[in-house]
């Protein structure tokens, strides 16, 4: 299945373009799929570098100016960090059922990473030579969590919990604010539960620069982790070497394999869960059943009508 939009009764609706693969066409189709999301880095690198240099030279002044420009939020040194009062208010807005899910997920993630944890060890040879390794946790880590209109508690948990397990002393989370200068309650609750030491209402390349070089309000960290859009990815690439990073993550992708027994609604939900992340995201279904393909297409149209990130989904599926 490929992607595209169509008009019905004068209204644009999202559809997945369905391609039936035969032996004589599989080569060309697979080649096209590999080209579906070309490297667009060159178009953004100049702007990202400009932001980084401005924050590096002007600190908070540039940081808050870019936050207002890109996120529409007016912040100061006094309001950039999330307060305990804001976190308390967030808990009041999160349902108990969701809080239970966050805690269960957090526990599962912790158990997994505790099994990965490395330990120091030392040994002495017969001749008295000491061999070994000393494992020391980083002093500080900056966790980037996408935000704005959407909430990504999974990104919060999957980045903060491993840092806590490793023994990082200072975990600073950054996430873009809404226009009103607030962070989504679910994100705040997940951060508090996971153990973030500080939460700052900043995002984009300017947040990465602030974490890498430090400002009057944002402390410099030893490592920056977490996903983000192309600006965040390029910013992490640019500051790598001055500060450690986890990786340069590209746009979200998902490939779902399904036969005739698959539930079309579940398949559609899996595809859209990635398509809503980024305009450059790719969502692909490979199925042996034409009936399933058409049913998934119909489910996607139904889902999109009620999803708040409709515009992003439309662009990612275009």
Region annotations inferred by a language model:
Residues 158-160, 188-190, 216, 240-242, ...:
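Short, solvent-exposed amphipathic alpha-helical segments in soluble enzyme
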Residues 1-15:
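Short, Lys/Arg-enriched N-terminal segments with co-localized hydrophobic residues
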Residues 284-318:
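NAD(P)-dependent aldehyde/semialdehyde dehydrogenase
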Residues 123-189:
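Conserved small-residue-rich beta-alpha loop and adjacent elements
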Residues 195-282:
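Conserved NAD(P)+-binding/catalytic subdomain of aldehyde/semialdehyde dehydrogenases
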Residues 13-139:
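N-terminal Rossmann-like NAD(P)+-binding subdomain of aldehyde/semialdehyde dehydrogenases
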């Amino acid at each position: 299945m490929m992607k595209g939009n169509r008009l019905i009764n004068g209204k644009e609706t999202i559809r997945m373009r369905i391609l039936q693969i035969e032996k004589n066409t599989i080569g060309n189709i697979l080649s096209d799929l590999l080209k579906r999301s070309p490297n667009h880095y060159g178009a953004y690198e100049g702007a990202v570098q400009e932001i980084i240099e401005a924050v590096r030279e002007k600190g908070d002044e540039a940081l808050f100016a870019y936050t207002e420009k890109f996120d529409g939020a007016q912040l100061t040194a006094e309001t950039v960090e999330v307060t305990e009062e804001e976190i308390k208010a967030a808990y009041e807005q999160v349902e108990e059922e969701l809080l239970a899910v966050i805690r269960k997920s957090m526990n599962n993630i912790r158990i997994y990473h505790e099994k990965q944890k490395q330990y120091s060890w030392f040994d002495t040879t017969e001749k008295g030579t000491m061999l070994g390794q000393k494992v020391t946790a980083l002093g500080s880590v900056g966790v980037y969590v996408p935000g704005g209109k959407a909430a990504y508690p999974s990104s919060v948990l999957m980045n903060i919990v491993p840092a806590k397990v490793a023994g990082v002393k200072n975990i600073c989370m950054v996430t873009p604010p809404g226009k009103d200068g607030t962070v989504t309650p679910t994100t705040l609750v997940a951060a508090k539960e996971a153990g973030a030491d500080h939460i700052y209402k900043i995002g984009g390349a300017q947040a990465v620069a602030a974490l890498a070089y430090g400002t009057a309000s944002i402390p410099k960290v030893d490592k920056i982790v977490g996903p983000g859009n192309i600006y965040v990815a390029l910013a992490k690439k640019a500051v790598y070497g001055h500060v450690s990073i986890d990786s340069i993550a590209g746009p979200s992708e998902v490939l779902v394999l399904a036969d005739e027994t698959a539930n079309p609604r579940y398949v559609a939900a899996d595809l859209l869960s990635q398509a809503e992340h980024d305009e450059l995201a790719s969502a692909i279904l490979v199925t042996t059943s034409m009936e399933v393909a058409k049913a998934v297409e119909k489910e996607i149209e139904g889902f999109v009508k009620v999803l708040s990130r409709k515009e992003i989904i439309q662009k990612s599926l275009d």
